[in-house]
Every structure is written in C-alpha cells, then in structure tokens.
A protein has these predicted regions:
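Active-site-adjacent structural elements that line small-molecule/cofactor binding pockets in enzymes
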Residues: 1-222
Length: 222
C-alpha cells in the first residue's frame, strides 16, 4: 500500500474486511474459517496496518499476526494513509472500525438500516473514546438502474436473476429509473452517508444506464 501511495502521489486508500465469500477463499487456496476467527483476524490486521502506516515501528503479538519492531519504509506520502473497514457486524466489525478505521463502508443497506448501523458505530466510538468525526461514513450500493422505464425493466430482470431470493438481507440497490435513483441518493444523504460507492457486478454493462447515471444522478451527489 505504501508503494501505491507513492505511485499515486498520496492518493492511496486501504480497504479491508472480515471476508464473507467462501469461493474467494477457495480460489486462492485459503481455508475459510468461522465468523469469530475472521473477526479476530480483522481486528489484529487492522491494528497491525494502523501501526505500520502511522508509527515508525510496529509491535503486535496476536493469534494470527505478529510484528516485532517492524518498520514500514519508505513511509507513506500521506501523513495518515486512510484505513477503511467494510462491513456491518454490530458486535465485532463496527467495534474494530471504531478503534482503527479512518473510514467505514457498509455494503448493500437501505437508508434506514444504514442509519441504524451508523448509530451503532457512534455508540462504539463513545464507549472507546474515539471521535466519531474522525471516521468517514459511506455506503456500497448495487447498480441496477435503467436509463428509462424499459431499461429499468431489463435491469430489474438482471437484479432478480443475480440475487433472487438469496439476498442475505441486502437491500441497498440503485434500481428503477434515474429519478428513483436520485431519490435514493437523497435518502442516504439525509441519514448521514457522506459518499456512495457504486458496485458494478458482472457484465455486460448497460452503457446507456451508466451515461444516464452520470448525467442525471451524479449531480445530486455534489
């Protein structure tokens, strides 16, 4: 990450999470541990990265990661290379975010649910003595918008085909027409989301929809 920060002249941001998709683990030959183990790994990893990014030397003795007076040279270009934590688990992920994150990104949540999770993060910040304003708050939303009513109908078919009944509680998607997408942007803004990250899943992509998004929805983000 430090090398990328230098290549980009101080624009790198590091994003991590506890992991959730077993096929991704299997594809690279890693075992897929239980949720507790993955949350333990995330907490230790976040602490290790925070130390490496911000301290001359890093020392951590954990179950999964150990650093002994480890340097990170050259130092990042940024005074503080941003560490983002993604996820919405209230007991562990949000607690880890409150401890170490410069930014928190929640995946595929509707505005009301995102607001509730954001309030949980605030409570963890208060309990741990962290300034809530030190953590940027964003939401990851799926893109299933059409440029017009016909395009929206096609996008809805794709949404149902890709997610169907197995949505894992996810409800945060840009669906329908640009007008409806703009309304959703306003709803997220109203509950405190600072940015929206647009998730484009497997193609082929609807370029008319993307152009309509750029022309009609992006202005609502600024």
């Amino acid at each position: 990450m430090t090398t990328i920060d230098h290549i980009s002249n101080g624009r790198a941001q590091c994003g991590i999470g506890a992991g959730w998709n077993e096929p991704e683990y299997r594809a690279f030959g890693y075992p897929f541990p239980d949720v507790k183990t993955r949350e333990d790994q995330l907490e230790e990893y976040a602490e290790a990265l925070s130390l490496l990014f911000n301290e001359p030397f890093a020392d951590i003795s954990g179950t999964h990661y150990t650093l002994r007076h480890a340097p990170n040279n050259p130092r990042p270009v940024q005074r503080r290379l941003p560490l983002w934590i993604g996820g919405a688990g209230e007991k562990r992920t949000l607690r880890t975010a409150a401890r170490f994150a410069d930014g928190w990104n929640a995946p595929y949540l509707a505005p009301a649910e995102w607001k509730r999770k954001n309030e949980v993060l605030d409570r963890w910040c208060a309990e741990l003595g962290r300034d809530r304003g030190a953590i940027a708050r964003t939401v990851n939303v799926g893109f299933y918008m059409g440029a017009d009513a016909k395009g929206a109908a096609r996008a809805e078919e794709r949404y149902q085909g890709e997610w169907g009944a197995d949505r894992r509680g996810f409800t945060g998607f840009l669906r329908g027409t640009p007008e409806r997408a703009s309304e959703l942007v306003d709803e997220f803004r109203a509950v405190g989301a600072e940015r929206l990250n647009i998730a484009l899943r497997s193609g082929p992509y609807d370029w008319d929809a993307l152009d309509a998004f750029a022309q009609n929805v992006v202005p609502a983000l600024t």
